[in-house]
Regions:
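Hydrophobic face of amphipathic alpha-helices that form TPR/SEL1-like repeat modules
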Residues: 1-49
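Generic alpha-helical secondary structure signal
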Residues: 11, 131-134, 149
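A glycine-rich phosphate-binding loop feature that marks nucleotide/adenosyl-phosphate handling sites
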Residues: 29-30, 86-89, 122, 144-151
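Short glycine-rich loop/turn motifs
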Residues: 34-38, 102, 150
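Glycine-rich loop-to-alpha-helix module at the N-terminal edge of alpha/beta enzyme cores
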Residues: 40, 45-139
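Conserved small-residue-rich beta-alpha loop and adjacent elements
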Residues: 137-157
Length: 157
């Protein structure tokens, strides 16, 4: 029987044996600028983990424009649908992505297994689960009464 610890060790060995290329993602598409930075292990500067494409002013402007365009539809998306995105991500992180997140945190931030589990996996899963709950609570508290001449409300974007 393979234990969770064995799977975590396998993922750590797999990721530490790779050098990956990280593009920018703008409007859902990979962008490779050719302006490359290097990501090394903080505890072993000779061990390269990744080469990443750095954004310049044109890429930053494209990302801003893309974000503003995405906001138009996202802000009109029902609260439950938006919550479902975070809840699905939390489920994936709590399950099949957990070892990948923990291993990458250990390698890129010099955390031990316990620190990675608490600081990366547990906290992020909690945030992705708590925030939809609290958003719904805020949504439910929209005032029913407003004094004459005013209208109290919350707009959830």
């Amino acid at each position: 029987m393979v234990s969770i610890t064995d799977l975590a060790k396998e993922k750590l060995a797999e990721l530490s044996g790779k050098e990956i290329e990280i593009p920018l993602i703008i409007n859902g598409e990979e962008v490779k600028t050719g302006n490359i930075g290097t990501c090394v292990m903080p505890h072993d500067h000779g061990h390269v983990l990744a080469h990443f494409h750095q954004a310049g002013e044109p890429e930053v402007q494209q990302a801003i424009e893309s974000s503003l365009n995405a906001w138009k539809s996202w802000s009109k998306t029902h609260l439950q649908e938006r919550a479902d995105v975070l809840l699905k991500a939390a489920d994936l992180l709590a399950g099949p992505w957990r070892n990948t997140l923990n291993a990458s945190t250990m390698l890129n931030m010099s955390k031990n297994a316990y620190q990675a589990e608490i600081d990366a996996a547990c906290e992020l899963i909690d945030f992705w689960r708590f925030n939809p709950y609290f958003a719904q609570e805020i949504h439910n508290q929209n005032p029913m009464y407003s004094p004459d001449g005013t209208r109290n409300s919350s707009e959830h974007r």
